């Protein structure tokens, strides 16, 4: 089923259908408004797929707007990474990229309009006093002693704020609403604060910056957004969103709708916590394959299609819930099982010699995908010396062990049946070489005498093997909800990265960055985009062939 055929339905799409049917709107215009203060993560992918997906399905428009109202935390590095992530996920924004900073002059004029209407005032309480005066969920707030300044006085003070005549934290512009409101967001929220910091778009033009709640709704209205979609934590903020638009002179009145945010198990989404992982060098960086960032998932080997499918499967609801990591892993397994070419890699090699096989090599033809002949085949050399995985041999084993056992037979993938005859060990009793014989009449066919050989193992020709590093990534945390722990860093999974040195078949010698494979019997891997090269192959494990954590949780 294609993504187009699997068009989802949810409460937001039902609202849009009704709006179009009643003529409330004649078209659909959404937006994706990230703050450029970090890298996008899988939670943002849900919002991207929703906003851009809705616009695409209804032949509408979706803007990419950077909510760049805090110059202290923002950087052009994040702007560039966000643009790349959106495009990599398969979406294109409508028209030019927007920035909230594009509207700073207009926002300033709207702030003056509120002052002139007696609906905003300059407050000189300290940030700590503002918090104290705001009250709690059980206690109402109390009015600032500066709340009843005259309109003229507020206009003069606001202009002084803009001119840089106040230090940071010494003055701010607040909306005059209701300090006794049951909704704390409506207790005279701050609209502008002072920050002496260079802005990545505006330079040093401004030293006062509008707050998110003031900027967001006006930006939506200026852009003609019909459906402003955001996550549930902004539900109470909708009251302020509507209040601002109702009290300024503006024609367009967008409506905000909230949906549940994505909470994925075995990871954290908080920018503060993610930044701590990077700053403390627990991970390599924002694109570390263990991170839930889009760039991290991409480097690990996740495809854009698998992430879009994941967002489709989890759906859009009004109720927060935790999504199992297995749901995300299932999407990439399904994608790569269908589309990734097969190859052989030995991650923990032990030497195997086929003593009755002549010297030289034999070229075997192997399908790139067992169920897709259109993906073609590749030539793989076979010789009397090969590498197999150390876990695929035992000197003694029970009947459930379907691999190579001393004195017994097994089939080599797409090759011959071999029998283990003897082993050679080092001084520490470690096996260094397995000596075998082979049946030269069993190349891709059963033995003529009818004997049954059930096990199949993979291999790489020792003569032609290409050395490679394998980075076995796993879940970064040992508990499903690390963010709820007192010390989330104490729950780091010590096995989240295991590095192995082994070999791959020669067809992978020129593996391209981010190229994905199914390494037979091992899992899904991709060539690392940062460290892999022709001289030093590095493959990241994207996912195992099956969910090993399901068994762990049951034990």
UniProtKB/Swiss-Prot annotation:
Keywords for the protein's UniProt record, in alphabetical order: Aminoacyl-tRNA synthetase, ATP-binding, Cytoplasm, Ligase, Nucleotide-binding, Protein biosynthesis
Subcellular locations according to the entry: Cytoplasm
InterPro entries: aa-tRNA-synth_I_CS, Gln-tRNA-synth, Gln/Glu-tRNA_Ligase, Gln_tRNA_ligase_bac, Glu/Gln-tRNA-synth, Glu/Gln-tRNA-synth_Ib_cat-dom, Glu/Gln-tRNA-synth_Ib_codon-bd, Glu_tRNA_lig_a-bdl
Motif 'HIGH' region: where in chain: 34-44
Residues spanned by motif 'KMSKS' region: 268-272
GO cellular component: cytosol
Protein name per its UniProtKB record: Glutamine--tRNA ligase
Source species: Photorhabdus laumondii subsp. laumondii (strain DSM 15139 / CIP 105565 / TT01) (Photorhabdus luminescens subsp. laumondii)
């Amino acid at each position: 089923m294609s993504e187009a055929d699997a068009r989802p339905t949810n409460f937001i799409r039902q609202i849009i259908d009704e709006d179009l049917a009643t003529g409330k709107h004649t078209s659909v215009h959404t937006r994706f408004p990230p703050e450029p203060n970090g890298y996008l993560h899988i939670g943002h992918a849900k919002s991207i797929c929703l906003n851009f997906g809705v616009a695409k399905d209804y032949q509408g428009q979706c803007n990419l707007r950077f909510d760049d109202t805090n110059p202290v935390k923002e950087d052009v590095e994040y702007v560039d990474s966000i643009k790349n992530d959106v495009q990599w996920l398969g979406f294109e924004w409508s028209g030019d990229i927007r920035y909230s900073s594009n509207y700073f002059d207009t926002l300033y004029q709207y702030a003056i309009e509120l002052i002139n209407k007696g609906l905003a005032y300059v407050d000189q309480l300290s940030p700590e006093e503002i918090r104290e005066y705001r009250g709690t969920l059980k206690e109402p707030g109390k009015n600032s002693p500066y709340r009843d300044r005259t309109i003229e006085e507020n206009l003069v003070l606001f202009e002084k704020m803009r001119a840089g005549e106040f230090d940071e934290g010494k003055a701010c512009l607040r909306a005059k609403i209701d300090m006794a409101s049951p909704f704390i967001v409506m207790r005279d929220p701050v609209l502008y604060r002072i920050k002496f910091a260079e802005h990545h778009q505006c330079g040093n033009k401004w030293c006062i910056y509008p707050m998110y709640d003031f900027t967001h709704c006006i930006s939506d209205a200026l852009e003609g957004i019909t459906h402003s979609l955001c996550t549930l934590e902004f539900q109470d903020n909708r009251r302020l969103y509507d209040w601002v638009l109702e009290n300024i002179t503006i024609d367009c009145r967008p409506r905000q709708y909230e949906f549940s945010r994505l909470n994925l198990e075995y990871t954290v989404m908080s920018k503060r916590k993610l930044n701590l992982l990077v700053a403390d060098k627990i991970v390599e960086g924002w694109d570390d394959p263990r991170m839930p960032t889009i760039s991290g998932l991409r480097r690990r080997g996740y495809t854009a299609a698998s992430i879009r499918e994941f967002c489709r499967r989890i759906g859009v609801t009004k109720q927060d819930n935790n999504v199992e990591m297995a749901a995300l892993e299932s999407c990439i397994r399904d994608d790569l099982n269908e589309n990734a070419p097969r190859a052989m890699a030995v991650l923990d090699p032990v030497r195997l010699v086929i003593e009755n096989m002549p010297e030289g090599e034999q070229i075997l033809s192997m399908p790139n995908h067992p169920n897709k002949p259109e993906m073609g085949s590749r030539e793989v050399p076979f010789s009397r010396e090969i590498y197999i995985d150390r876990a695929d041999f035992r000197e003694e084993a029970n009947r459930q062990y379907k691999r190579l056992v001393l004195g017994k037979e097994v089939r080599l993938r797409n090759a011959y049946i071999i029998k283990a005859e003897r082993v050679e060990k080092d001084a520490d009793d470690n096996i260094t070489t397995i000596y075998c014989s082979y049946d030269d009449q069993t190349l891709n066919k059963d033995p003529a005498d009818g004997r049954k050989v059930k096990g199949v193992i993979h291999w790489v020709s020792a003569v032609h093997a290409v050395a490679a590093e394998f980075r076995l990534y796993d879940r970064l945390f040992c508990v499903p909800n690390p963010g709820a722990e007192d010390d989330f860093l104490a729950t780091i999974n010590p096995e989240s990265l295991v590095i192995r040195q082994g070999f791959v078949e020669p067809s992978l010698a020129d593996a391209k960055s981010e190229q994905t494979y199914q390494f037979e019997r091992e899992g899904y891997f991709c060539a690392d985009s940062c460290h892999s090269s022709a001289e030093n192959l590095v493959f990241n494990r994207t996912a195992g062939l099956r969910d090993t954590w399901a068994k762990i949780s049951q034990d």
